[in-house]
Amino acid sequence: MPKKFDDIVNEMDRKIELLGEEIIKNLNLSVEGYCTNKKDICNLVIYKNNNIIKNLESLEMYSVKALCLYRPVSKDLRKLLTIIKLCSMLEKIEECAVKISFVLLNSKFNFDRNDKYIKRMASLTEEIIY
C-alpha cells in the first residue's frame, strides 16, 4: 500500500529540518576553524560534506519522485517545489562552509583570524534558516 502524500511531505519536512541543522553546525564549525586556525576542524567539515550533499540530493530526488507519482495540485505542489528549492539553497550554504575550510587548509600563514564579518555572516545565515 503506497504512503499517503501528506505522510511523504511530513517526512521530507523532518529530513530537511535535520539537514538544515546539520549544515548550520558545519558552517559554524568552519567559521570556528577558520577564526582559530584549527585545520582539524576544517578537515572534519570537509569530511562531513559528502554525506550532507548525498542526503540533500536524495531528498531532492525523493521530492521529484513524489511530484511524478502523486501529481499534486496547487498547495501540495508548492510544498514540493519549496522543498526542492530549499535543498538547492542548503547545498549552496554547505558549499560555502566547505570553501571557508579550504581557504584555511590552503593558507600558508598561521595567525588568529578573528574576523568579525565572517562571524556575522554565519550568524545571519543561521537566522535565515531558523
From Swiss-Prot:
This is Uncharacterized protein MJ1011. Pfam families: PhoU.
